[in-house]
Amino acid sequence: MSEMSYPAIPDPEGIERVYGELLARAPENKMAPRLDAVRRAVEILGDVHHAAPVIHITGTNGKTSTARMIESLLLAHDLRTGRFTSPHLESVTERISINGEPVPDATFVRVWDEILPYLTLVDEEFAARGEPKLTFFESITVLAFAIFADEPVDVVILEVGIGGSWDSTNVADGIVSVVAPVGLDHTDMLGDSLAEIATEKAGIIKPDGYLISAAQDPEVATILLDTARKQNAKYAFEGVEFGVVERARAVGGQLLTLRGLAGEYPEIELPLHGEHQGQNASLALAAVEAFFGGDRALARDVVLAGFAQVRSPGRLEMIRSEPLVVLDAAHNPHGVRAASTAFKEAFELSHVHAVVGILGEKDALGIFEVLREEYVDSTDATFRLYLSASESSRAIAPEELQEIALDAGFDENIITVYDHLDEALAIAMENALFEQETAGVLVTGSVTVIGEARTLLAQPAQESTAQHNAEPEELAEAAETDSDELFGEIMAELAGEEPREIPLEDSLGLPLADGTDSPEES
């Protein structure tokens, strides 16, 4: 295995420039699906998409967590890994990881500058034919392949952006195709039935490959199975060839016994909460077994070491303990239900303060109905909703969220509305801290909300100035709003410190993906 060290030198100006150039390109939802533009780009770069074997992952929920588990297991086998996932929480470099860490700023910027002339050539070729230039997601997919070839890596873990057949990542030939649980999401792009969505996702199954599927709705499973047979691919399904044998709660996560394709693995510690993460672990284990051929068990000590190192930011992530603050990026009803079950099991709170923001293309009514069922109808806990929005142009306005929550059956007395996320967070945390019984804050509903909350809460209390999902000029204006001052004061109060004025240049941060980005929320 090749070893490489990186200078730990951040380059925020370079990242901001490159990210701006990416954001200047069209988002995926503004054009018809295609693969020829990405295929042309990777070909003129020397077929960089063939530089390493690929494990390709699609599905509706659990893709990123499964990708991280696969990565960790491969790292435990001393393989050099490249992982491509989307979207990011705080920095665009998170989308492209080497050996489990975001690619260094210097590498991200250098490789982008090296491939940009070739991307421009493809842009010109397609423009001459009256077709759109490379989009944001097409371009960053090509960048990922180029970085993985530049490193190089031993194996690529490749997460689909949206769908499968027409996703930019599908120019790669995955030797293992992983399908996480499939449900209804992105219906505006993939179709409004499970059959249509499953057919699209089955498109990543390659000839003579290996399909590893989570437990699925029978209609979905049938489509995946038929596709695998047509492609002469091997296949294995959770609950049939592999799965979770036993599961028990443990401090900081859970203890699992997993049945893989070729062996059983008892007492595996997974530092993530929830039955759904146990199922993701079984999916990841089977995928890695399949990568190594599928006919021999892996060494238990290596599997144990791999799972012990798994982290999945923004997935039931406890970011603060006093008061308890948990972030979860679930953004559709299926994901919210799984996360809610896990949250209640892991934390057993008597008071739940939920800060919720949802993007416009999502099933907001379905999300609120699940929240009501999980936290109001089926528990004795006190539940309050703090409705707000990220800075994404796609975010549903808090007042509109309130109407949807009321339609979902929530009592208006437990709902409060905030124009700014920092204010909603601050008030929810203050209320949770001073409850007489166990209380905590759950932030959920959107990857963009989670990313912004993570940035806000990761800062020292006296420096907690809101970093909005906007361009730098807008950030400067936002840094002086009343809500920012309130957030800083309350955060300082919670930390027992006096708030102090922060120089404007210290309050600025890079913009997160906004409405010009790919609409995917993994």
Language-model features: locations:
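Short functional linear segments
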Residues: 1-59, 65-79, 83-84, 124-131, ...
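ATP-dependent carboxylate-amine ligase catalytic core
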Residues: 10, 40-50, 76-172, 188-190, ...
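Nucleotide phosphate-binding/pyrophosphate-handling subdomain across enzymes
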Residues: 51, 155-158, 167-178, 182-186, ...
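Short Gly/Thr/Asp-enriched flexible loops that form oxyanion-binding sites at enzyme active sites
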Residues: 70, 165-175, 454-457
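Beta-strand->loop->alpha-helix junctions that form or flank phosphate-binding loops
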Residues: 84-87, 214-215, 229-249, 269-275, ...
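Acidic, Mg2+-coordinating active-site environments of NTP-dependent enzymes
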Residues: 122-129, 152-159, 174-267, 281-304
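C-terminal helical cap/extension that packs against the catalytic core
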Residues: 217-227, 232, 252, 324-326, ...
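Short, flexible loop segments at boundaries between secondary-structure elements
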Residues: 390-392, 463-522
